[in-house]
Amino acid sequence: MSSEMCTVCGLPKELCICEEVAKEQQRIVVKIHKRRYGKEVTVIQGIDPHEIDLQDLCTYLKSKLACGGTVKDGVIELQGNHIGRIKDLLSKKGFSASQISL
């Protein structure tokens, strides 16, 4: 085992549960915004960028939903209307389904 210890929980890095606890405490809001020419964008907000790597989460969602997307100002934007599948995908990544509002 490595001698590195987590500064938050005091456990070794391999056993650290800080990120899982942070995921369960997030209050996530998913909305659909209309853009130019009637294009729809799924916007995911409420995830703390200091505790969760938004770029990795965005890459995961883009690959599962087969769409384009980006991270802007702590908000994940995905091209298209994906509100039907987003709750299930976020739950699989460890976020609490009861904390996700559509």
UniProtKB/Swiss-Prot annotation:
Record carries keyword Protein biosynthesis: yes
UniProt cross-references to Pfam families, sorted A to Z: SUI1
Keywords, sorted A to Z: Protein biosynthesis, Translation regulation
GO molecular function: mRNA binding; translation initiation factor activity
InterPro entries linked: DENR/SUI1_TIF, SUI1, SUI1_arc, SUI1_arc_bac, SUI1_dom_sf
Presence of the UniProt keyword RNA-binding in the record: no
One Gene Ontology term from the biological process aspect of the record: translation reinitiation
Regions that span the bilayer: none
Record-stated family: Belongs to the SUI1 family.
UniProt xrefs under PANTHER family: DENSITY-REGULATED PROTEIN, DENSITY-REGULATED PROTEIN HOMOLOG
Descriptive protein name: Protein translation factor SUI1 homolog
Organism: Methanothrix thermoacetophila (strain DSM 6194 / JCM 14653 / NBRC 101360 / PT) (Methanosaeta thermophila)
